[in-house]
Amino acid sequence: MKVEELAESISSYAVGILKEEGIEELFPPQAEAVEKVFSGKNLLLAMPTAAGKTLLAEMAMVREAIKGGKSLYVVPLRALAGEKYESFKKWEKIGLRIGISTGDYESRDEHLGDCDIIVTTSEKADSLIRNRASWIKAVSCLVVDEIHLLDSEKRGATLEILVTKMRRMNKALRVIGLSATAPNVTEIAEWLDADYYVSDWRPVPLVEGVLCEGTLELFDGAFSTSRRVKFEELVEECVAENGGVLVFESTRRGAEKTAVKLSAITAKYVENEGLEKAILEENEGEMSRKLAECVRKGAAFHHAGLLNGQRRVVEDAFRRGNIKVVVATPTLAAGVNLPARRVIVRSLYRFDGYSKRIKVSEYKQMAGRAGRPGMDERGEAIIIVGKRDREIAVKRYIFGEPERITSKLGVETHLRFHSLSIICDGYAKTLEELEDFFADTFFFKQNEISLSYELERVVRQLENWGMVVEDHHLAPTKLGSLVSRLYIDPLTGFIFHDVLSRMELSDIGALHLICRTPDMERLTVRKTDSWVEEEAFRLRKELSYYPSDFSVEYDWFLSEVKTALCLKDWIEEKDEDEICAKYGIAPGDLRRIVETAEWLSNAMNRIAEEVGNTSVSGLTERIKHGVKEELLELVRIRHIGRVRARKLYNAGIRNAEDIVRHREKVASLIGRGIAERVVEGISVKSLNPES
């Protein structure tokens, strides 16, 4: 089907944009599904990676905008939101307004009311409803990318509640779900009252195989071929032909070790001097130096310990072909789109406190990355196994079906978190209405069991915590409404309220309080971390909680204290690399912990204000910047971080006025180029105080 045939549905101007993007003709499944896309009905599209699901959704959103509607495009990760936003901006050429909302959970982002297409995450979209963003009711089309993540232990419940809330808010709402894998597609379609389209067509054919004890067996339809080959040879023969290789390892350590090993191969084919500098721009610690050396030689590792900037450098360089091999942990498979000619899965196991096999759906996500449209004649996905797992790899993973998608909403923590918001948002004023709401969820569709007992227990718990009152009908208290808007677990809100109502806190006391909450990620206590126990005992009078060392909570408590001590070192301006070495974490881990702690510190401070406790008031900004209180005025200035601020402060430069007055001195301390940018920023701000 030629794209010109779409002009009647999306306008000739929109067709012009598609042609500018090099799209002259639709893929076969796109041509088959396009009628359903323009029907206006709810729709579920289950198609492999790169088969063109997103383009179909874009056409639906463009058509919606032409009709005067507004679309919300929901993705699972912030990084994906940024990627989609950049991709959708092409539609601005025909007058559409594209927006993105991924930040502060308390913000309503009212400026997005003028946008035609808004990209966001499911958590942010849910928080926009909780904070009563005025424009959210005007959304007429909801696109859910990766709707199979209803199955996610962590994110699935929020996605399910978001869809249920939005369908209740706007009875005429159109929902479009996109999925690469959906074994029980009819069940999800029934829940959404949707039509569905399923295709296994791929723009680049996929050949899958196993490498077992030096023998590679490839399965291409009904045919199979075999040959003797080593793992390293599989990598090199692909790189030699200018193909990209994506290797999946089960652990970070494995990913780093394999990337270092393979960099000796890729070094024969590339040299990346400039990229090395880009990797070391934000951090020059041990892991970053190892990554920079790999990248210089044309290989890279990719895992959650990398900084966001480093990940972007690696991803962009791999897409351009400057990096030939990326060795990643499985998290990459569900994240950004990085196709490669050959995907090699080094293990079907992952370690999660214990060793267990990955899901078939996880393998399918990894294998789905094989084959770059327009560049490769075919993609290859190869599993490396021992003799014991060969049959499982072939029967279950290569020829087997992904697991059925099941709702994860029935867990108490999810019920507690979402029941409070459902009451606060006015969807339920009685227990019966709360049950009615949950009867519209995917959980009820699948299980057809009442949650009345669990919901009553959750509501009584919220009553005991002072977040809900029941007097003829259910209503949120001031605390309950605040906790819902802050987007924290009600248990987190209760812990904050309980402690802050009765005691003032020191820095370490406040940081430990943050680390006590279920919303906070905690560091693992290693065998070599006996110093944590000693520090906990020394600081016991400053902590809001100190269990007996014989209690079952004691090990958990030590992990809370270790995380709090890590944050304390951060706000005391300890060197970033020293912190990472001391606590056994990577720079990306530290940034993630800091970001979560900043969000929770803000929530803690808001609750502290409600109970008249001022002891935690300056902490959020200190966590954000990683500084002592005396540097706050300097780090608020653009281009001045914790290291530059300390240099300036120690030299007697204390504020913006000092910087402008002593320009030459500032230039000698932080470099002339940076100093000029800082001064320019200060001048602009003084001319435009609101910028």
Swiss-Prot record:
InterPro entries: DEAD/DEAH_box_helicase_dom, Hel308-like_dom4, Hel308_SKI2-like, Helicase_ATP-bd, Helicase_C-like, Helicase_Hel308, HTH_61, P-loop_NTPase. A motif (DEAH box) lies at residues 145-148. CDD domains: DEXHc_archSki2 (cd18028), SF2_C_Ski2 (cd18795). It is an enzyme of class 5 (isomerase). Its EC number is 5.6.2.4. Residues 400-691 are annotated as: Required for helicase but not ATPase activity. Residues 34-200 form the Helicase ATP-binding domain. Keywords: ATP-binding, DNA damage, DNA repair, DNA-binding, Helicase, Hydrolase, Isomerase, Nucleotide-binding. Transmembrane segments: none annotated. Residues 230-421 form the Helicase C-terminal domain. The N-terminal region (1-400) has DNA-dependent ATPase activity but no helicase activity. DNA-dependent ATPase and 3'-5' DNA helicase that may be involved in repair of stalled replication forks. Belongs to the helicase family. Hel308 subfamily. HAMAP family: Helicase_Hel308. This is ATP-dependent DNA helicase Hel308. It comes from Archaeoglobus fulgidus (strain ATCC 49558 / DSM 4304 / JCM 9628 / NBRC 100126 / VC-16). The gene is hel308.
